[in-house]
Amino acid sequence: MKKIMKEKHVVPDEVLTKEFLSQFKTEADVSKFLKQLHAQVLEKMLEGEMDAHLGYEKHSVSGNNSGNSRNGSYPKKIQTEHGEAVIPIPRDRNGQFEPIVVPKHESRGLSIEKLVISLYAKGMSVSDIEEEMREIYEIELSTSAISIITNKVHQAAQEWQNRPLDPVYLIVWMDGIVFKVRDNGKIINKTVYLCVGLKQNGLKEVLGMWVGKSESSAFWMGVLTDLKARGVQDILITCTDNLNGFTDTIRTVFPQSSTQICVVHQIRNSCKYVVYKDKKEFTADMKNIYNAPNKEVAAAELDNLEKKWGGKYPYAILSWRNNWDDLTVFFQFPLEIRKIIYTTNLIENLNGKIRKYTKSKLSFPSDDAVKKMVYLSLMEIEKKWTMPITNWGLIMNQFMLIFENRIQI
């Protein structure tokens, strides 16, 4: 992508004098100079980022009593086209500064294209990026050029969505996140449905995203069929909300899979029928059900709940009765596995992180725009998914004992 620089960034011929050029005796001299120049440019760009982060320039009186200030810098080695260089990375006193042009945990500065995509991933519009590039980095890029760059994200998202998947996942959590999207001239709610799988090495992986107007078992049938077409042969445990018909849909595509309905969703659903003054006590009584040591004790606690509250809130109890078998699947497993399957907290936490990246967007112009933004958010989030889940060694041994014929080591 060719960038258009401001006129003042073009090196005039009068600067390239014989006197200036005489300092370079070898190609190594030129390379050393360019490395130093590259480092100085990055340093200036980082200073511009810090100015924008704090809202005032260095040594400005505007920073007095602002609540945050510069706090020196730390040296960082980076790789340039001309070799390794050390540049100072500025810090702020509150520890909130996140450099963009030289990202944390990376040893290379971003290219212009990657810089634009990084800004786009943070929820900035094309016009916002154009202004940011001009004011902070002093780089002139037209909005059309920025659009061309961000449109490449759509192709990358499609390739990611269609990539092959592992044949077996130990657990797959399923949930959705709602966005405002323009559709036929109207702003409506649409849901991006996500599946997160637990791999046989203990790492989490987002398997895909699907956009729909409303959740239904027929919709999820399409999602599960897509997973199978991309290579998934077996899912040991699925964790879902209590959508009517969802469990049967899963069994149609993955007949051996055990499905656990999210207990937290069930608690919220029951509490809808309970008046505010009783909710605290009612919720405490419900905890006795899912904190029970086994299914038999849990059933007795449900009976106790019904004796105490059934006359006043029959519908709050009825939903437990109607979904009992799918709500209590987790009792079949050891405690370490129970903790990660009886709720969809893992994927709800993921949704919360996506919200942080998309909070500046009140609505999206199209489904594709939503997909691009969520895809970029997921790529940023997955960078931190580098370690197996807690107690992984113990959990894997438990899975191998319980599902020894279905796990391929």
Residue ranges and their predicted role:
Residues M1-G72, Q79-H82:
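Subset of Sec-pathway N-terminal targeting signals
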Residues A52-N64, N68, Q155-P167, F179-N184, ...:
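Active-site phosphate-binding and catalytic loops of NTP-dependent enzymes
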Residues G67-K122, E138-I148, P167:
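Basic, short loop/linker segments at the boundary and entry of helix-turn-helix/winged-helix-like folds
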Residues P90-R93, I100-E106, I139, T143, ...:
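RNase H-like nuclease fold core
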Residues S127-E138:
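DNA-recognition alpha helix
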Residues I237-N244, T249-D285:
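Conserved beta-strand -> loop -> alpha-helix junction used to position metal-binding or nucleic-acid-contacting
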Residues P255, N288-I409:
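Acidic/histidine-rich catalytic cores and adjacent linkers
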